[in-house]
Each structure stands twice: as C-alpha cells, then as structure tokens.
C-alpha cells in the first residue's frame, strides 16, 4: 500500500502534543490513498488510514457529504457529538456499506462552533478531535469558522484550508 512518502512540518502545541502538517499534491481524482503518520525513523507511527479524493467536477459524479453545525459540547447532553459520530454516522455506514467510510463519504462539513471556547486546548482535544478521530482519519473534514472558535490560534494551527476561492472572497 505505502509506496511513496512525503514530509512536512511539525511543532509542539501547548507543550503536550505535536501538530504535523503535510500538503499532498498531484493526487488523482476519485482514487483511494492510504497513509500513516511516522515520527522520526519509525520511532512512533499511526495506524494505517485511507481516504478517497473527490471525482473531477467535470464528471458530474454523485458523492455524499455530511453537513453538521454547532457540534460544541452541550452540558445538558455532553456526549451528543460522540453519539452522532459513532452511533449515527459510523454505525450507519458499517451496517449499510461494509464499514467503508472513505468509500461512502467524500467529506464532512462542520459549519462553525466546533468547540464551546476556541481558546481552550482541552476542548479541542477532548470535545472535538477525540470523539471524531474514527471518522476524520478516513473522511476529509472541511471546518467553517464560527463565533465559538473566537479567531483563535488553535483553529488556525489545526486547519490549513485552501485559499484559492472566488477572487475577493478568499
């Protein structure tokens, strides 16, 4: 599966974790890619994950996305995001489509308010990334900045989004 490698950058975040950034270029549309994150000379490495690139827009091929909003933790129902991811999305794909998350979903769009307080490191880790890891390791995430993210460094560090939009609206 893994015949090529690339490298990127990494830095320590909040003293207790590392953020790794890699830009993948020249990917072929509608193709499954496998990846793992390797630190150093295989000092540590992740499980093997996969994702599928979207089809060419000119093909007009159908694809599925999930759109959700306001996924920040609610004290009256603190596990709702985890339930949506695991009991909703992942269980449904597993039952209906042989657990092929990458094959069934082209992307997940979260239209803001990923956490309650964007300046809180533990909320990003414990309330957003940890519950969603099983989904986002196979399906690309496209987050949209909400008022709860509060224009924080964490959002900017975690998400490197394309800036090639319509001129004047990048």
Region roles according to the model:
Residues 1-145, 149-169:
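Divalent metal-dependent phosphoesterase catalytic cores across multiple superfamilies
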């Amino acid at each position: 599966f893994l015949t090529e490698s690339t490298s990127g950058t990494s830095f320590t975040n909040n003293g207790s974790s590392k953020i790794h950034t890699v830009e993948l270029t020249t990917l072929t549309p509608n193709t499954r890619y496998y990846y793992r994150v390797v630190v150093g000379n295989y000092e540590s490495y992740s499980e093997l994950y996969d994702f599928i690139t979207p089809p060419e827009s000119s093909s007009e091929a159908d694809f599925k996305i999930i759109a959700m909003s306001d996924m920040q933790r609610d004290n009256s129902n603190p596990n709702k995001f985890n339930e949506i991811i695991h009991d909703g999305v992942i269980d449904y794909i597993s039952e209906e489509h042989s657990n092929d998350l990458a094959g069934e979903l082209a992307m997940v769009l979260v239209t803001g308010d990923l956490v309650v307080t964007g300046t809180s490191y533990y909320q990003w880790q414990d309330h957003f990334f940890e519950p969603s890891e099983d989904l986002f390791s196979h399906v690309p995430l496209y987050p949209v900045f909400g008022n709860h993210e509060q224009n924080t460094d964490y959002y900017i560090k975690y998400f490197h989004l394309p800036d090639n939009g319509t001129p004047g609206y990048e």
